Amino acid sequence: MIETDRETFTALADDGPAIVRVAADLDIDVAPLTAYDALVADADDHAFLLESAEKTPASDPDGAFTPDTTTEETRHARYSFVGYDPAAVVTVDPDDTTITRLRDDPITDLLDAPDHATGDVLDRLRSVMPAVPRRNIPTEDRQLLDGGLVGFLAYDAVYDLWLDEVGVERPPTPLPDAEFAVTTRTLVFDRATDSVSLVCTPVADADTATDVYDALEAEAKRVQAVLRDATAPATAGIEVTTERAGDRDAYTDAVETAATAVRDGEVYQAVVSRTRELDGDIDPRALYDALRAVNPSPYMFLLAHGDHTVVGASPETLVAVHDDTVVTNPIAGTCQRGASPVADRRLAGEMLADEKERAEHTMLVDLARNDVRRVSAPGTVSVPEFMRVLKYSHVQHIESTVTGTLAADADAFDATRAAFPAGTLSGAPKVRAMEHIDAIEATPRGIYGGGVGYFSWTGDAELAITIRSGTITHTGDEDTLTVRAGAGVVADSDPDAEYEETEAKMDGVLAAVDRLRTTDDGEAVHR
């Protein structure tokens, strides 16, 4: 069952401690969400599901989208990851870093570093990474998450990274700056080979190799047995008792304030966001399943972290580091979907012909190029894709791709710092735009506008921008779902149009809620 035999594993661990990657092929036929449900059961305080969903006719009831097999539509869609039973959780708060051990695992003995409480949030995450060799890592045709840190970087980390040094006082923030599970067991679904494997990255040395291998064999057999008997969970409804959409006038006033700052030469653009909140009985797994159906996206995520769960369908890469390549994916320019392919093309053409949209997008691509250049070798930054229109369930976006070759003295944490936050979620110049956001927006952003993803043991990393998402806070007998969206404000922005843009960007999550909404007596309501 395990691809690496016992003798080879023992030899790899002989002069350890080392992180040794092993994989077991599983003979199962279950969907990733079913596997997630079966493996985490009632112990899902910390677990994750990361997927890349292709768009299908079933996800587009108006028939406006016909899927194809071009690179831009399938580039993310090969792997799904289910992480369960993490060894520990790393929580980075403004003044502290906490490592909470969740089970007996040798890797937890390697997590404490002398400097894990110093530096900024990304320095502190880096310091947690075990300073031991990584062995048995495939070099070709592999997924890039081989265990590591999986979680979120909240937008509010900007105070630690950028705003503290310019004297902006940090407000109370609802969530940690970062929270990442230390993952050594990951279920990997590979669509290209139609296979499922359990990838484990245990710590072993000469004294422990035999026992570690025995435990891996037992875990692979246990997981296969659990998943062979797994069935898709019944779809839970969502009962919403209270909704708060915020004050429209307050938002349009905030947009006008930002536009005035642009006209006064303070910034070129600022992204102003607003929040909707729904209280009630909200099942995160049901919401994820519905969101995947109505808004399949390159980055689908279900991230359970104790008293809060993040569910999302992001189209946009914050930063990716694969081997020595840095990638970011600025998206700026939004229009509605049409009711037919002809209407889609008309709306997309109007968007591409709009001078404001083109200028805004070009500015943000230039900002992304500058971000990537900060951590890239000289002369390696390029824009292989510029101003392409991609379609999603409720909107169309103008997208570009910026790449560079990672400098020899930089790593994935440096690349994340350079890209964070995305210019498409802050504005330009970044720091000055963030100062205005702090002054204009009524509440801290929390996870919205940050990043969700992973830092692999291998040095690879990939984080999506946390947009088209919702954070479910579990408090007592009731849950609160917070959905947030923003619009880029320039000198001639129409406040009412920007408000409608935020509504369109929230539509994916809210449509998923409506798909599951029930009445007080449990009857389904579909609107």
Curated annotation (Swiss-Prot):
Pfam (any one): Chorismate_bind
Keyword Repeat annotated: no
Region (Disordered) location: 53-72
Keywords: Amino-acid biosynthesis, Aromatic amino acid biosynthesis, Lyase, Magnesium, Metal-binding, Tryptophan biosynthesis
Family that this chain belongs to: Belongs to the anthranilate synthase component I family.
Miscellaneous comment as given in the Swiss-Prot or TrEMBL entry: Component I catalyzes the formation of anthranilate using ammonia rather than glutamine, whereas component II provides glutamine amidotransferase activity.
Name by which UniProt lists this protein: Anthranilate synthase component 1 1
Upper classification of the organism: Archaea, Methanobacteriati, Methanobacteriota, Stenosarchaea group, Halobacteria
